[in-house]
């Protein structure tokens, strides 16, 4: 799909050489997130550690694609002439003095910059091909270097397109087989949902057509994806394989997060607007059958590990509400002194809920709730260092956002916007294991980097990898939970928020 409005290009460089990135398909009007800022890895990986193989062939890029950027094209500026200058969304390295080609190291950097503007396997969704293409041929209305390609039959355009297209069949030696899970992340400002394959840490599908997507969850059989749509106040039901929207279900108000009953029979949607509540959607008929009243607008809604209860949290009323899912009525409440933010659940050996870890507004840490006692029993503050983030990002009210218990129940992971990091604690003793720095964002015109603004957390089913959505960086960070080392930073779209794992069946 061609882009329909020009965007202002900015210089983008990634300092963490060796980390591979995959492009994503975007709406026509959505500028790629990497055009707004440059992300750098503040905790560099050792050489060769945890790196994933790129989906696009580097040697083809160097031998066939890169020469096009140096080529003289009558009546047009050379790509090299413009894209070695500052303030360019696609940046090319300056040739070494007296050389007519780039060194291998420079070509690697050119390659990394190019793949951010590419959707592997899909030339017509790749900005690298659409931006310099003539508008009448499906390109952007304006390109400062002129109409480099008059048509999609231009030999050079076809060369780049073939490089992009061939990525679908190029499998790097030693690559793992297709994984048994997918990580879904809602890009709230891009109107897309990106789907990541944990085996390659690349985007393998993009779902379009949902404005302001927020929560995401799945039917137990994995055939449906449920997305809460903030713009239309509906629940979108999406076919997982095709990405097509099957149905829109009207809600009682503006939604935030949602969850699924353990048997898959009910979708529970938190309603943020007053008076709040939890909408119940019957999964067979896809009808909203009732709204469970609670005190205050619902920011988050979860089902406990044993499936007996749903737990909602309200920012404005500061209330944590436990709903009995058999009676579909509020069973008990717990009042906090601050707004209730994300939560995570620890189970007893019999599957019942032992503790709930609750993030609160203005707290760089979390509260600990004993579920049986129906009381807060502790409050854990995250370390003061690292620090220095959150203010410029406008997130002083949410210094800690995003929390999750690993599927094996052995660790608790807690995001900190203030630290621009994620902290790991052992369970059940809550001993600090360490932290992992998240990408810094270096925007043009700013001398001091900002943080990536981590939002939400999910895991692979084997608990080996944690994924964190970075709303300020347009990316998802993958981290090895054993070594506490970053594996990959995956560009996904503008302002990624909710993130969830689907187990394929």
Q: Predicted regions span which residues?
A:
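Mature extracytoplasmic/luminal segments of secretory-pathway proteins
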Residues: 6, 76-79, 398
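Alpha-helical and His/Cys-centered functional microenvironments
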Residues: 7, 14, 31, 218, ...
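Predominantly soluble domains enriched in secretory-pathway, periplasmic, or organellar proteins
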Residues: 171-505
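Sec-dependent N-terminal signal peptides
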Residues: 2-24
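Detector for intrinsically disordered, low-structure N-terminal pre-sequences
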Residues: 6, 13-15, 64, 117, ...
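Serine/threonine-rich, low-complexity intrinsically disordered segments
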Residues: 6, 10-12, 42, 306, ...
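Aromatic- and Gly/Pro-enriched helix-to-coil junctions and flexible linker segments
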Residues: 23-176
């Amino acid at each position: 799909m061609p882009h329909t409005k020009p965007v202002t290009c900015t210089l983008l460089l990634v300092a963490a050489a060796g980390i591979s990135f995959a492009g994503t398909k975007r709406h026509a009007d959505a500028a790629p997130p990497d055009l707004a800022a440059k992300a750098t890895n503040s905790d560099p990986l050792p050489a060769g550690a945890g790196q994933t193989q790129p989906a696009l062939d580097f040697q083809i890029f160097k031998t066939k694609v890169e020469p096009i950027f140096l080529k003289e094209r009558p009546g047009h500026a050379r790509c090299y002439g413009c894209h070695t200058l500052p303030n360019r969304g696609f940046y090319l390295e300056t040739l070494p003095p007296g050389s007519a080609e780039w060194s291998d190291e420079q070509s690697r950097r050119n390659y990394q910059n190019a793949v951010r503007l590419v959707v592997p396997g899909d030339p017509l969704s790749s900005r690298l091909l659409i931006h310099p293409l003539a508008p009448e041929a499906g390109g952007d209305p304006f390109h400062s270097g002129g109409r480099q390609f008059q048509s999609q039959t231009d030999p050079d355009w076809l060369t780049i397109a073939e490089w992009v297209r061939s990525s679908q069949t190029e499998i790097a030696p030693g690559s793992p087989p297709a994984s048994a899970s997918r990580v879904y992340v809602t890009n709230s400002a891009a109107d897309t949902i990106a789907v990541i394959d944990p085996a390659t840490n690349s985007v393998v599908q993009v779902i379009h057509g949902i404005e302001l997507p927020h929560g995401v969850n799945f039917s137990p059989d994995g055939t449906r994806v449920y997305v809460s749509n903030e713009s239309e106040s509906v629940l979108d039901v999406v076919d997982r394989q095709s990405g097509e929207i099957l149905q829109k279900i009207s809600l009682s108000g503006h939604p935030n997060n949602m969850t699924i009953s353990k048997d898959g029979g009910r979708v529970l949607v938190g309603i943020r607007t007053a008076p709040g509540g939890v909408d119940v959607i019957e999964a067979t008929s896809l009808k909203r059958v009732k709204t469970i009243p609670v005190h205050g607008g619902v920011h988050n809604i979860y089902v406990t590990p044993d499936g007996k209860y749903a737990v909602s949290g309200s920012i404005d009323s500061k209330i944590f509400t436990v709903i009995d899912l058999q009676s579909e009525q509020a069973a008990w409440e717990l009042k906090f002194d601050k707004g209730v933010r994300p939560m995570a659940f620890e189970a007893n050996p019999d599957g019942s809920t032992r503790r709930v870890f609750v993030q609160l507004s203005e707290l760089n840490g979390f509260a600990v709730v004993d579920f049986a006692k129906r009381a807060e029993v502790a409050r854990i503050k995250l370390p003061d260092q690292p620090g220095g983030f959150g203010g410029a990002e406008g997130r002083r009210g949410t210094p800690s956002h995003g929390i999750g218990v690993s599927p094996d129940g052995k660790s608790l992971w807690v995001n900190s916007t203030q630290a621009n990091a994620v902290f790991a604690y052992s369970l059940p003793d809550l001993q600090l294991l360490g932290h992992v720095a998240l990408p810094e964002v270096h925007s043009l015109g700013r001398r001091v980097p900002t943080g990536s603004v981590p939002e939400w957390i999910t895991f692979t089913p084997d608990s080996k990898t944690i994924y964190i959505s970075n709303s300020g960086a347009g990316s998802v960070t993958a981290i090895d939970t054993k070594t506490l080392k970053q594996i990959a930073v995956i560009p996904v779209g503008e302002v990624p928020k909710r993130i969830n794992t689907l187990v394929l069946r």
